[in-house]
Amino acid sequence: MKAKDIVLKKSEEIEGLAIEGPWLDEVESLEGVISYYEKIGFQATHLGKAVKIWRKVEEKRKGGEEVRVFLGYTSNIVSSGLREIIAWLVKERKVDVIVTTAGGIEEDFIKTLKPFILGDWEVNDAELREKGINRIGNIFVPNDRYIEFEKYMVPFFERILDIERKLKRPLTASEFIYEMGRYMDEVLGKEKEKSIIYWAYKRDVPIFCPAITDGSIGDMLYFFKEERHDSKLVIDIANDIVKLNNLAITAKETASIILGGSLPKHAIINANLFRGGTDYAIYISTAVPWDGSLSGAPPSEGVSWGKIKAKADYVEIWADATLVFPILVWMVMKA
């Protein structure tokens, strides 16, 4: 075979979407640019597909069809400015079930007291420790936020104890968080109106947190119980798994939107295993699959477990959620 025949090998014709980006003289808005994403290629295409999937879910819901939307996110999502976007989604009844970590609860509450501050990645962390400043990436959290948080948690724990005495049973973590929303409604001012927990309480959206003690809430519980050795305060996580699984089982269809990985991701897709898998899935993550971690497992791996239906409409965007989630929400809800 001649070298030219090898290099210029004849190809078969294929059909598909032509790769194309926006011609900037022809688009008049960022929305117009983003409308090209599906045709750009690489992760832009994945973001474009995510827009289509979520729009399909929204159209069904607006048409009266039941698609129960599960939203999962790790605590760093709430550390960032994505917190307000999630709170808006809850306020507007765009999500039905939330699963997060302890940080996703406590940081939402703390931000109603004092803000987190934009810092830098390249700093002397030992000096920050001396100053009592905690760092989450390039976000700084002075420790007085946690001191203030404890001032609110002590009377809140007392309230939970009273409720549990009256009910003669422990509250589940989701009930604990619901009562936190009620507490915020009573003791906080206007600042609560950008809180996820507050709007979940107002809209009756359950927030599940299977690892509720794995954070500052756990620290506060430790201090509370150590200082009151007779304290009977208990949080029940066993009954929450029944409630979460049943929310998946009883839905006609489900959509799972997951920011990051870890416990929230698995809690949602595992609940959907009980119904034969979720129907729609959007993952946004920077985790990689080759270490076998759940955080890095792509949707297709979930299919092998029965947690995502084989015929489900799904996509994973490998990107920092702070970059793409605002675009995704805007394109689905506002464009």
UniProtKB/Swiss-Prot annotation:
> Pathway involvement?
Protein modification; eIF5A hypusination
Q: Which reaction does it catalyse?
A: [eIF5A protein]-L-lysine + spermidine = [eIF5A protein]-deoxyhypusine + propane-1,3-diamine
What are the catalytic residues?
307
Gene Ontology, cellular component aspect? cytoplasm
Q: Does the keyword Transferase apply?
A: yes
Query: Which branch of life, at top level?
Result: Archaea
Q: Which cofactor does it need?
A: NAD(+)
Quote the EC number: 2.5.1.46
EC category name = transferase
* Function recorded in the entry: Catalyzes the NAD-dependent oxidative cleavage of spermidine and the subsequent transfer of the butylamine moiety of spermidine to the epsilon-amino group of a specific lysine residue of the eIF-5A precursor protein to form the intermediate deoxyhypusine residue.
Question: This chain belongs to which protein, by name?
Answer: Probable deoxyhypusine synthase
Originating gene:
dys
